[in-house]
Amino acid sequence: EHIYWAPEPFVSFAEACPALYDRTVTINGVSKAYAMTGWRIGYAGGPKTIIAAMKKIQSQSTSNPCSISQAASVAALNGDQSCVREMTKAFRARHDYLVAALNEIPGFRCLRSAGTFYAFPNVSEAIQAKGLKDDLELASLLLKEAEVAVVPGSAFGAAGYIRLSFACSLDTLKETIRRLRRVIG
């Protein structure tokens, strides 16, 4: 909901369909929007009965995060949000570059998104052109020959795709594309 750049405002399920309000639980965290990866702070909002049941399960399955992480998360959520807007602008610029560059690589087809810091191109044609079995083999090839780490789409139930992060500098992305072109063609 924070890393989003479409012209239309973000709409939650409960806003889109008020009849679902009493059955909707929204789960989020601070890792992505506030660059607090590893702090492991999440939160949920929803009907009191569901949240109460979630608290019972959570209290028996995990321990609490440290108080420093909790205080930092509260400060992030309640503080000035301009850093999130600036980060989102940077992500959008990197997204636009990466999607365009990936679509110039033979056998890669990547759709534009409205907010994320991952690209998820369909690489089925590249897999076939390289004589590979699947996205796992392509990921292995890219790691070995291009020294580019990607996550096979099959890890997300999407065989024939790969996931690349663009939570890095534009220079790093340009080098990534150069290496991908060298290996793929």
What residue ranges belong to the model's regions?
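PLP-dependent class I/II
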Residues: E1-G185
